[in-house]
Each structure stands twice: as C-alpha cells, then as structure tokens.
Design a protein with these regions (language model features):
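Transmembrane helix-loop-helix hairpins in multi-pass inner-membrane proteins
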Residues: 1-27, 32, 83-195, 275-337
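Hydrophobic alpha-helical transmembrane segments
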Residues: 4, 8, 42-46, 73-78, ...
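Hydrophobic/aromatic residues in alpha-helical transmembrane segments
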Residues: 13-16, 26, 55-63, 101, ...
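A short amphipathic helical element positioned immediately N-terminal to and/or at the very start
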Residues: 28-34, 105, 204-216
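Short helix-coil transition sites and intra-membrane helix breaks within transmembrane domains
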Residues: 51-58, 63-65, 88-99, 267-278
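Membrane-embedded helical hairpins/re-entrant loop segments and their flanking transmembrane helices
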Residues: 55-82, 243-258
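Membrane-interfacial helix-loop connectors
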Residues: 67, 243-268, 272-302
C-alpha cells in the first residue's frame, strides 16, 4: 500500500513539474521552436549522460578498491543504476538505495560496513568536486555585468562552501576531531531520535576520518577526484548540449553556478531525486544570467528527461539483475560457512 501511495505521489509530482514549468515559461506560443532543435546535440547529451554515470560507477569502484574490496565495473555499474532507480522513485529513497547497494555487495562477499564506508566516501568526493565546480563557475562569472544582489548572495554562498570544504579537510585530517564532532551532532540528534548512541557515532566518525586519510590520499585522491569531476562535468555537458540544441549558449560560468546550486538544493530530501527543485533552480538562475525564459525551460526539461527519466530504464533492468543475483547467492551462504 505504501509503494502505491508513493507511486501516485511521484506521478502527480512529475506531472505537475512538467506541465507547470512550461506554463510559467510562456511556452504555449514558443514551443514551436522545438521544430528547429538540433537532434545531434540531443543525442550527444544522452551520450554525455552515459559517460557521467560511467564515471560515477568508476568512482565508487575506486573507493571500494581503496578500502580493500575489489568489484568488477559491471557490478559497480549495476549497483549504481539500481540504487539510482530505487532512490529516484521513492521519497527519502537514498536509504532504500543504500539497502539495495549493501545487500547486493554482501552477496559478492563484501561486508555491509565496508559498503557503507564506501558510500560515505563516494558522497564525500562528489561533494568536494561539486564545491570546486561551484567555485570555478563563480570565478568564471566575475567579468560579467551582474546585479549587486547576485554578487552578495553568490559571495556569501562561496564563502560558506569554502568554509565547509575547509572543515571537511580539517576533520578528515584529524580523526579525533571527527569523533568529537560526530558525538556532538549525535547528542543533538538524540533529542529527536532517542535511539542514537553518541559514543557509537563518535567511533564511526573517527573511523571514517581515518579511512578518508588512508583511502583518499596521494594518487588515490587524485584518481577519485578525477572520476568525481568527470561525473559532474559530463552531466554539466549534457545540460549545455540541451541549450545548444535550442541554439543558445549560456556560457560555462553561469551554467556551472546554476548546476552546482541546483545539486546543492536537491540534497535536501524534499522530493525524490530533487524532482521539481532542480528544474526550478536551473531555470531561475540561467534566466537570471540572461537566457530566454522559454529556451531555459525547454532546455532544462529536456536535460531532466535525459538526466532523471532516461536512466530509470537501465536502472530497472539493473535492479532486477541485482535482485536475482542476491536471491541466487542467498541459499549458498550457509554452505559457504
């Protein structure tokens, strides 16, 4: 029953986003411009999106290898796509996606704790790459004639993300600090969730910081950061290609700022996969940088079809594959002991 309710809400939300945004953009008279869209750029956007997902699978695979758990690329890609499928179909779906991830790799002999650590470190690297992308985009917009309001807001945002990045590296370099920070956060969280153990949280925080120091240092860090950046840049390229398909080029700076801001906003688990949040943020910021509203709405909706909806098809196939894999591995576990 809960899955049916989630499905109804999901369809209603998607229908609302994809029907309301065109009206807000005044597309009833401008949608005829789609006839002049360049198909080659749309196909290239799909290819860029596939490359983005491949980079993310390689990032996850690289992190797991640094933790001592080696998996084939095919399995890593299946896990990523299956987790994507689940997390993008249910509210607060990241928890369900994590369970799919853990159970699949357990069937391959990887402990749940290692998988959890791999997921956390993968998210950390993606966050670092996203912050760097935002800062780069902000610097790239420095020569533009922008409103004082934008410069003030963007300046504050840049200061905050740099501060967060500094805190992340400081905590990662000192496991004791990470443990104390986790303990304090757990004490605050225990007011809302009494079952949270601050000491256990402190141990987990210290362990993750130690793992980050060992697994994400030197060449391992450069390789992981490269794959994380590749994931974001190919995804950003997919968005840019959608604009180019409609004969408009926003420029790297504005697009990077809009993209990073949309991804940061989508981290708040209001809707599955940031549905609605990403679209509105991308349209608002690109229009603020001078993009025609109708073009921005069409490009963003096209990008989200490629970025959000299209991967659900291989995601469904991957989900069935990993479920069958787990089911086959289940009966054989007792005999393995």
């Amino acid at each position: 029953m809960r899955w049916i309710l989630h499905g109804v809400l999901f369809v209603a939300l998607a229908a609302g986003v994809f029907s309301l945004l065109p009206r807000l953009g005044g597309l009833t008279r401008d949608a005829s411009g789609l006839r002049h869209a360049r198909p080659a750029f749309i196909v290239a956007a799909v290819v860029a999106q596939a490359a983005s997902l491949g980079c993310y699978a390689q990032l996850y695979r690289r992190i797991l290898a640094a933790l001592g758990a080696k998996v084939r690329f095919r399995l890593a890609a299946d896990v990523v796509l299956a987790s994507f499928f689940v997390s993008h179909l249910t509210p607060f779906g990241s928890a369900t996606g994590t369970l799919v991830n853990v159970s699949t790799l357990e069937a391959d002999g990887i402990e749940a704790s290692t998988t959890g650590e791999g997921i956390a470190l993968t998210s950390l690297m993606s966050t670092v790459a996203l912050i760097v992308l935002f800062g780069t985009g902000f610097v790239a917009t420095a020569g533009r004639h922008l409103s004082r309001t934008y410069l003030t807001i963007a300046g504050v945002a840049l200061f905050l993300v740099v501060a967060v990045l500094a805190v992340v590296f400081a905590v990662g370099a000192h496991p004791a600090i990470a443990g104390r920070a986790a303990r304090r956060l757990a004490r605050v969280a225990r007011r809302f969730r009494p079952g949270i153990d601050p000491e256990q949280a402190a141990q987990t925080g210290s362990r993750l910081a130690s793992l980050a120091r060992s697994a994400l240092s030197g060449r391992a860090f450069l390789a992981s950061f490269g794959f994380a950046s590749g994931d974001l840049l190919f995804d950003l390229l997919s968005l840019d290609l959608m604009f180019l398909a409609l004969h408009y080029q926003p420029g790297f700076g504005p697009l990077a700022v809009a993209y990073a801001a949309a991804n940061i906003a989508s981290a708040i688990p209001v809707t599955p996969g940031g549905l609605g949040v990403v679209e509105v943020t991308l349209v608002a910021i690109t229009v603020g940088f001078g993009a025609p509203r109708a073009t921005a709405v069409l490009a963003v909706l096209g990008y989200r079809i490629v970025n959000y909806w299209l991967p659900l098809l291989p995601g469904a196939v991957a989900y069935l594959r990993v479920r069958l894999r787990s089911a086959k591995a289940g009966p054989s576990r007792p005999s393995a002991g």
